Amino acid sequence: MRKEVKLGDICNILNGYAFKSKEYVEDGIRIIRITNVQRGNIEDNDPKYYDISKIEELKNYMLKENDLLISLTGNVGRVGLLPKKLLPAGLNQRVGCLRIKDERTVSIEYLYQYFNSYNFERDCINNSKGIAQKNLSTEWLKNYKVSIPNLNEQNRIVNELIKIQRLKKLKEQQLKELNQLIKSQFVEVFGDIHLNDKKWNRNKWRDVLIIKNGKNQKKVESFNGKYPIYGSGGIIGFANDYICNENAVIIGRKGSINKPILVKTKFWNVDTAFGLEPIKEKIKSDYLYYFCYFYNFEKHNKAVTIPSLTKRDLLNIEISVPPITLQNKFSEIVKQIDKQKFEIEKSLKETQELYESLMEKYFG
């Protein structure tokens, strides 16, 4: 049996304090800002602090373990539970804090799962004010209606979702470890590419690969296109024509210049991305990709604001060229690890789909 209640009837909703940046110190009260509230968790990137001696003065804005925090500006509707390790912490302006009034009837973990749903975030976005930047009011939150079952049912739902989330994190960690294994195998087989400690022959890029400029995709873009369209950050659409052949590497011409992508199929690259086609008898695509992964392209950056590379500079990069037999050996290692990754990715996708279906079932 569920009942609909206004959030303000079951929660105290707190607004944050306008901490002054000129009063930041090296350590003390951690300030929880909009940037710390990400989808599903509270991140601790670039921490800012206030003097610990002001803790009594700021007592109305001091946070507690498991406070449910919500972003009220920008990416509105993102929520996370505050972990104990981030205390003592103060609530900054435009971050909301939700505290349960009666824990005998409502679980904060249940509300966290509820508000971590797509439907809640969509409602927040649709009910925000502002054009350039979205702003969500705590008054709207107070009147937001939530569907609450009895406490036992809340706990059952939470436990079910937590199990799936843990399984998802486990699979993500397995993928991370397999990716790290490939990188460590690259170093073990080929050594340090910067030092060339294994004394491989050295060539210029112009001798071992072809750089293909990207082009505007408008004339070839098609919803039913056969070939993926890549920017420097990944797939952005599909096309009925291609520029680069299979087993080529993408690096950014502008923007994301230090994030190479290995593409196994033919593809169209846009004008902000270079396609690198290895000359097969000299260099393998797996080797080229990991060379690019470990290489710092920032040294060739010609721009002040948006990072930018030129084809001329890239063609003059020196690359160690191990024997092709050794490159083939590394490719075989990658192939075997990729098989494991494929199975985990497949299982991860199924786990994610199960999680999304349950979120829709309970909170849709």
Please report, for each region that a protein language model flagged, where it lies by residue.
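Sequence-specific dsDNA recognition surfaces
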Residues: 6-21, 35-65, 206-246, 263-264, ...
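A short beta-sheet element
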Residues: 33, 53-116, 231-298, 302-314
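Periplasmic-binding protein-like
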Residues: 120-123
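Short coil/turn segments at secondary-structure boundaries
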Residues: 20-27, 46, 126-128, 198-201, ...
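Non-catalytic DNA-recognition/assembly elements of restriction-modification systems
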Residues: 1-16, 143-159, 174-216, 220-231, ...
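Short, solvent-exposed loop/turn positions at domain surfaces
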Residues: 18-19, 57, 169, 303, ...
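A short glycine-rich beta-alpha junction/loop motif
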Residues: 4, 88-96, 106-109, 129-152, ...
